[in-house]
Amino acid sequence: MYTPPVQRRNFLTSTLGAALMSTMAASGNRADAAQPTGAKVAPEFYVWRQYILKNGTQPRRLADFLQNAAIPALNRLGHTPIGVFEVMAGLPSPTLFVLTPSSSLESLLAIEAGLERDDAFMRAADPYLNAPATDPVYLRQELSLLTAFPNVPRVEVPAATAAKGPRLFELRTYESHNERAHRAKVRMFTDMGEVDIFRKVGLTPVFFARTFVGPRMPSLVYMLVHENMAGREKSWDAFRTSPDWKTLAATPGFSDAEIVTNITTVFLRPAAYSQI
């Protein structure tokens, strides 16, 4: 959502910011723009934002801001779909996550200016923007900048979203002990067929991404969607017993013991107004 100007300037002048700008420049236009036949879809960038809240009025006030001010304005700026997720298990509650996709880093950095020029947003966001320090809308925010895997280049909206059907989201973070190990794990998903195995056994992706900026690096993050917990267990059981997975996991240099130091799982449910 909102990026303070000083943080934006610091980011742009950093070495990492320059590298990401180069990546962005090479990524081209949105995937839904006209593409040459056979052209690859450029991977998206994601802002993954965590709001830490306290019980009381904060969850309702933040939801009002997101639903009535932020999400409509972000959609007008071309950022869609916006995912909003509430924690079911794995983290303290109340905690809210917001996923903002973008075709480029440049468009993410332009969000602040775009919102400030949007009169409808400024009116709808007034209770949020003018909340006093003694009664804030949230305790704090934490965010990560992610870049999508080339073989899962865009958010895949679950089929159940349109009908507001049941959706259990599973957010998984894989940490590695160094950059080489991290690249090896990413390669398993992007080049060695692990995502294909997921799909084959019924593990349905929402997104797969590398963490470019954020905590617990080097790491990758992905989200799956299930109908319910029983469906999740069935799909994971099928994955663990898959001959394809057993062969891949036994590849020298690619076992979890060699390249993954920690896996974190958080279960989420969609907010009523989530677009994912």
Give residue ranges: language-model regions.
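Hydrophobic h-region of N-terminal signal peptides that target proteins for export
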Residues: 20-25
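Hydrophobic, ordered structural segments
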Residues: 52-62, 68-76, 80-162, 176-178, ...
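Surface-exposed interaction/gating patches
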Residues: 148-229
